Every structure is written in structure tokens, then in C-alpha cells.
Amino acid sequence: MTDITKLCDRAYYVFDFRVLEKRVAYLRDLLGTKADIAYAIKANPFLVEGLRNQVERLEICSPGESEICDSLGIDPRMTVISGVNKTPAFIEKLVKNTDGRIYTVESLTQFELLAALAEKYGKRLKVLLRLTNDSQFGINEEDIESIIENRERYPQLDFRGLQFFSGTQKTSLKKLKRELVHLDELLLRLEEQYGYRSPELEYGTGFPVAYFGEDLEEEALITGFRQLLEEMRWQGHITLELGRSIAASCGSYFTHVADKKRNHGQNYLILDGGMHQMIYFGQYMGMKQPKVALCGKEDRQPTDQWNLFGSLCSMNDILVKALPLPEVEIGDTLRFYNTGAYCVTEGMALFLSRDLPAVYLIDSEGNLILARRTMETFPLNTPNQEI
């Protein structure tokens, strides 16, 4: 098999679908058969192909993500259209040309838009009412109750239920319980006061990933969460929206040592990547140490500590501080683990007009696929001379 540590002479990513499939199977085993899984594409769009047969739904949060799914031939009936800024043109295009999608309602404006478009095109649209978590997302309980109370005015809408998501990296079972209890009470109130039995709840769990060696009892957390679902008085179809928890472990980021130096007693490695290409959630000025390996020298003992900086002309472009490494040379390759979620897309990609890293995929059969070549960004930052 190809040595994935030597695929490119510049920084690059590798996402392994085999690891991805094992991760989904592991989560399903812990969660049981009660819940379906929706993958949030924003975590990593390069994984859509690897997950299309592994999850029940794909969560789309932008027109660009919709285009990605269309280019891959994803069945529209598998998609949920979410996001706070659903432009009329984007939603009308979807309503006019496709059937079977689910649309989230993030505001009363979106609600009226969906109702109007459904009537215009003679379609019955599936909608999920998103409950706010006291942020810019979703609508209040009072708005949800008003919509449900007056639902007969909107026969063109199929009210599928509620959606809720409050954030990522949740390590507290107590917090998850508080949210589910609140949702349980609202779902029961809708039934008791308005005669509406919600068919479905879509819930974003925000399960955490241990990027920096944290003591995370994941199995206990997820099995405890499963018990909370089973204790809900409302009983209906549950879909769990997952992104980071599914994707993180399948990814590795490879970057090369471009230079090395010692300044006033501190060792520095300059890498051909940096924070414009790779960033961990919770990483701040390299203060936390993710799992990193010096490729080909994993079995050697550390000989010194090194500060790992990227290629940007910025004091902030530090990936790791005081990382113990074996003897390291210019040209060596470093591998950053658990980079499958968000790392590839959250960096400041256009800063200093540096390159976008290549992306490789390993499919379920072990075949290596070049999903994106190294791309220069300077054309995007070059002023257009048109008048």
C-alpha cells in the first residue's frame, strides 16, 4: 500500500473512510436502534461520499454545501436544509427543482417564505421548527406554539417536529439531561394543549472529541445519553445530528519541516503548513498539545522540545509549544492526528495568499483518491482590473 506519509511535497490531508465507517458503527452500537444519525456536512464536506450509505441524513447549511451534494448525486430526500440565512433565491431553487427535502425554520420570516413557496409550486414541504438556545439560531417556544396552534392554516406544510442544537464539545451528562427534559416538556405541551403529536425530534448532541489528551469517558457519556433518550415521556422518531464526533478520528494532517532554528534558548521548527490550513477546536497559541508524530521516527525517544510554527508572517501562527520530539531535520514530516472535523475548513485560508493543502481520501476498499490538488490562493486575492 502507498505510504501516506509521502504523498506530497507540500502540506496535505488524508481522510480514511475505513476509520469513518468504524466510527459510525461504534456510535450506533452505543446509541442503540432508537435513533437515526444525520451528518452535519459543515464538519467536513470531503466525507459526504464516505457517509452517504452510513447515515440516514445529511445536514446542509449553505448553498455551497447543497452544490456539493448535487455534484455527488446525493438524493434530495436524504437532506435537511438548515442555516440562519436561507435566501429566497436559494430556497426557491430547491423547492422548484427537488422534492422530499426537510427544511428547518430558523425565523418567522423563513416560515412565511417556506409557506409561500410551497403554495406557489403546489408542493407540501416538510419542516422542522428549530427551538432557540438563546442565540441567533431558532425561534422561541411561544413562536413554536403559535405556529402549531395555527397549523391548519398551512396545509402546504408538513410539520415534522422540532430541531435543537446548542453547541459542541459537551462533556456534561447533566447539561444534556437539562436540554432533553426541556424538549420533552415542550413536546408534551404541544400535544396536550394543541393536539399536536410531534412525529420527530432532531437533536444535535455536541458529543466531544479529546484533541489534547483529555480524560474523556466517552462510552459512559454516550450510553448515559442513550438512557436519557429512553427516559423521555415523549416517544417519537429521533434523529441525532453529529459532525465532530463522527469525523474527527478519520483525518490526519501532514506538514513538512521547512526550517529549524534556535533563538535565545528556544527551539523553533518552521512548517510548510500552519493555522491557515489546520486548526483544532480549543487550540490557543499552541498552549495545548494534540497528538503529533514525527513520521518514520515514531519509535525514537524525544531528545528536545520544539515550538512548531507555520509559514504565516504572524506571531499567532503557532501550532504547538514545547513539543518533545526525536532528532528532527529539515524535510521531515509531522503528522497531526484527529483532524477529520473542521480542521480542513476553519483556518484563515486566504491569509498571505498561501496555498490550500491537497486532500486525499482512502475509500472503504483501501484505494487512495486525490480529492483536491494543492491550490494556490493568490488568484483569489489578485485585484480584478475590469471597469
Sequence positions of predicted segments:
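Charged (often Lys/Glu-rich) extended helix/loop segments that serve as interaction or gating elements
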Residues: H237-I387
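Conserved, mostly hydrophobic/aromatic
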Residues: L20, K42, S62, L94, ...
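ATP-grasp fold ATP-binding core
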Residues: K126-T132
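Active-site loop/helix belt of alpha/beta enzymes
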Residues: L117, N133-H264, F351-R354
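Conserved beta-strand positions
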Residues: I60, I81, V105, L129, ...
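A charged N-terminal "starter" segment
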Residues: M1-V105, F111-L125, Y154, D158, ...
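Flexible loop/turn segments at secondary-structure boundaries
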Residues: P45-L47, E67, T168-S172, F207-Y211, ...
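Electropositive phosphate-/nucleotide-binding environments in soluble metabolic enzymes
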Residues: V14-E21, P45, I60-P63, P88, ...
